[in-house]
Amino acid sequence: MELVDMRDLGSRAVMRWGSSPHARTNLSRLLLSLLLLEMIVMPFEKEIRDTILAYCMRDLPNDIWYENSFDFVKDSSLKARLISEFKNARFMYKIFEGLAAEDELLLAEVKMQMLMYASIFEATIHYVLFDQYYKSTPIVQNLLTQKVHKPFSIPTGQLSAINKLLFHDGKTIIPYFETLQKRDITKVRFDEKCIAAFQLGILTGIPEQNDSTADILPDIKQIAGMPPFCAELIRIYEVRNAIHLHAELKKEIDYHLALSKIAYRRMQPFLNQIRTKLNADGLL
């Protein structure tokens, strides 16, 4: 029986990727087989690597586009990380698109996309609010304080007498007062950050969602006075770690795949709105 060189077979299939539906259909299985083989032997041959890279890179923006998209981020380390995350999200999408991902691969695609985009949204909003531009505003400062209840300090002699008066239904009523204390910045939730960004005029509605036929997530929780765009960002962040292994059920995968596509489509309006607000406030 003649042995088939999987690397040669993969190379020939990859060269036909864009023109043959049959090669495209079987490419996922071929590349997975190649991956197992090459993990034992060596990396993909240069011809295969170059073809895959060319496919993944051909529709992606150049470096200048990414630099301009995050030009408001003055922290060079954070900026590099955000750009890298965005590039990786798009590159991985192209990989899975080329594989015509299904089942486990599709679930992997969705989980990676959601995690990456949610991380970009969160890190960017946090930076704009707390690190660079609006940290001194009352709206942001309110996020860093919280109301707490503290019991009154009552002398022991008086406390015993008071306890007799403050005993009801088998329980002791503890007198306390309400005060403000500093809140740990790590405890500020993403939805609170989005609401603050909306109140500051950083995040607004997007025109395409004014149409009754607009592509809006069906299960977002509308917040009074806030546009669907903000609610979508909150929903995207909520589900980033909620895609469980049982999500291979088709309707779950379809939902999260749609969500990951919306996450990508919302990234540009998100960045544009931040830049517009910063320009309007004379901060850029």
Language-model segments: what does each one mean?
Residues 2, 15-18:
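Short, positively charged low-complexity motifs
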Residues 28-34:
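N-terminal, intrinsically disordered charge-dense segments
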Residues 40-111:
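Charged alpha-helical initiation segments
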Residues 107-133:
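Short, hydrophobic, well-ordered secondary-structure elements
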Residues 125-221, 246:
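Short non-catalytic regulatory patches outside canonical folded cores
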Residues 198-284:
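Charge-enriched, short contiguous segments at helix-coil
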